[in-house]
Amino acid sequence: MNNFKYILFDLDGTITDSGEGITKAVQYALKHFGINVEDINELKKFVGPPLRDSYMKFYNFDEEKATEGIKVFREYYEEKGMFENSLYDGIVDVLKALKKSGKELIVATSKPEVHAKKILEHFNVDKYFTIIAGADFEETRVKKGDVIKYALDNLRNTLNDNEVLNLSQVIMIGDREHDIIGAKENDIKAIGVLYGYGDVVELTQARALKIVSSPEELREILLP
């Protein structure tokens, strides 16, 4: 599988273990609505998918309430939660090796792009990525398929006039079903990772091309 030239990475649950900051921010936001969740582990299901979708799915928020929930979430997240976060063991070695081998690395995340850039800069791994593509605050680009399309459009803009992007050379790496489904919506393949917040059933049902258990295994697959 080392014929992939362009590798798109999800951020939360794939590059960084962002669970603590996200779940605490959700806990803070839910408390604003009078919903007390003592065990933040119950909120891990919020890591990865668009926040609006999760509010509506898990707490039956309507659009207006979900919008307010996003605003309150950001109050905590932008002050503290963004950096209640850590890199997965071994992921930097993978990024370094892929970059050295000539692969082009891209981030495609449902997290707001401005937050993604700050986090990657904080951990000094932004240097490995040609493009950092994320959601916008206006929510015109939040769903994973839309973010991946945006990332691919940005990638096409970096190519020479006589170059055409061959989608068979592009692959998405992510830990949740929406990463795999979003990739398929854009006619690219996807690898699921089990060290994040998804599980083997979710990734299998989404039809990931391959499922790996660690960054090291990811490296073995993507490099000769």
Q: Where are these predicted regions, by residue range?
A:
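Active-site neighborhood of HAD-like aspartate-dependent phosphohydrolases
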Residues: 1-45, 59
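Substrate-recognition element of Asp-dependent hydrolases with the DxDx(T/V) motif
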Residues: 26, 94-120, 129
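Helix-loop "lid/cap" segments that line or gate small-molecule binding pockets
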Residues: 29-30, 50-63, 119, 147-155
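Metal-dependent phosphoesterase signature
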Residues: 56-93, 101
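Substrate-recognition "cap/lid" segment bordering the active-site pocket of phosphatases
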Residues: 114-171, 177-185, 200
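Structural recognition of alpha->loop->beta junctions
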Residues: 124-132, 202-222
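Acidic, Mg2+-coordinating phosphoryl-transfer loop and its flanking beta/alpha structural elements
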Residues: 172-212
